[in-house]
Amino acid sequence: MTSKYFSVLVFIILASNEVVAKRHSSTPKLRKTDFPEDFIFGAATSAYQVEGAAQEDGRGPSIWDTFSEKYPEKIKDGSNGSIADDSYHLYKEDVGLLHQIGFNAYRFSISWSRILPRGNLKGGINQAGIDYYNNLINELLSKGIKPFATIFHWDTPQDLEDAYGGFRGAEIVNDFRDYADICFKSFGDRVKHWITLNEPLTVVQQGYVAGVMAPGRCSKFTNPNCTAGNGATEPYIVGHNLILAHGEAIKVYRKKYKASQKGQVGIALNAGWNLPYTESAEDRLAAARAMAFTFDYFMEPLVTGKYPVDMVNNVKGGRLPTFTSKQSNMLKGSYDFIGINYYSSSYAKDVPCSSENVTMFSDPCASVTGERDGGIRDLILYAKYKFKDPVMYITENGRDEASTGKILLKDGDRIDYYARHLKMVQDAILIGANVKGFFAWSLLDNFEWASGYTVRFGLVYVDFNDRRKRYLKKSAHWFRHLLNGKKEN
């Protein structure tokens, strides 16, 4: 498996150099026509981060409601998403902003507990939740904007967490399947692009190893503020159930809806691109292991029905679950496209394997450090060459800025970030990667999880002190000019 990583790395280096050699050292200006004619440009959000209306119209609580409201000290500014951007009431304005900028797609997530307040069919379906998403989808289509719907973006219903531990319990696989079934049945006549899970790696790492995100579980030696958890075992159980939940969801879509609705179902995976810290053989192996425990962790089962060999070799003591032959067959090929959420890349350095205070973070025996540019192109090519050239969308890409309390609309650093990353996406396409679209994160400044409202990712400034008023930032105008056919840096 490691030799395959090196082969892929060589392909990437040679292909990248071939493109770069043909270009000027400075970043060329961009046109929309530099991308394929059917290339999709969109922006993304998630339900808990923007919707608000946490206790309105029958919505049940999620683990993020509990985590942020019961333990406000775990959020940097003590805030929560109970109101957030109030998109539940202001969705028409937000769709208007998408249209004004020129985006032709919107990636949003559906709140599980807004559809199923208690998380499962026994608790009943909330028609008001169905109505809200119908209204949002219809508004998007009326403006010529394609809906990309994410079924799960971290907001597990609290009732399922209480009943059997949420994604720690095998029961959640069927409950998620039933929830996805409702979404397909209710919205699939108009939604043609579905994402089952957003960043399962983040759920596993931050919710069950670091303990800094809901449900806030970890080993005590990792974070004394965690009330319970085991960073050596729970992450792998949760990851296993997430993968199986994805598999069951796409299985039900293909069985019941694919023929009539003709949609596509994928998954959004996050990872940086890890290069060796030095040219030593040890660091090269560490870089391969770092990829195995991040991107490959969730991609490999969808291609081969198995976990990466480096994970099998490194996770000692029977802590890594195994797939049955039936589950393995279900998972193989269980995607129509792969979403890539990319922000930055790092270097991986070999470190001794730990025998004490073991967690998922120590299992790769690699220290990931520093940041570097250029990783989005390399990660795309890695996915292309290693995983059978999948159809890909960049489902998230963006950068934050500190919230100062002032209305700041000039975000030149964000423009530079988007220009450079879009150019690298274009380079990957020229090499032959099958990338079909790009979604900026995020349309709006919003509740940024454990950071609360202390950072801003939006193309649109939201004034949280004045009725959630929206203002286009300079980066939004940059996208508008780009999408209207004008050259931009």
From Swiss-Prot:
Residues that carry a glycan: N80, N225, N357
One GO MF term attached to the UniProt entry: beta-glucosidase activity
Alphabetical keyword list: Disulfide bond, Glycoprotein, Glycosidase, Hydrolase, Signal
Active-site residue numbers: E199, E396
Its EC number(s): 3.2.1.21
Binding residues for a beta-D-glucoside: Q49, H153, N198, E199, Y343, E396, W441, E448, W449, F457
Domain of life of the native organism: Eukaryota
Catalysed reactions, semicolon-separated: Hydrolysis of terminal, non-reducing beta-D-glucosyl residues with release of beta-D-glucose
Signal peptide location: 1-21
Family: Belongs to the glycosyl hydrolase 1 family.
Identification of the protein by name: Beta-glucosidase 14
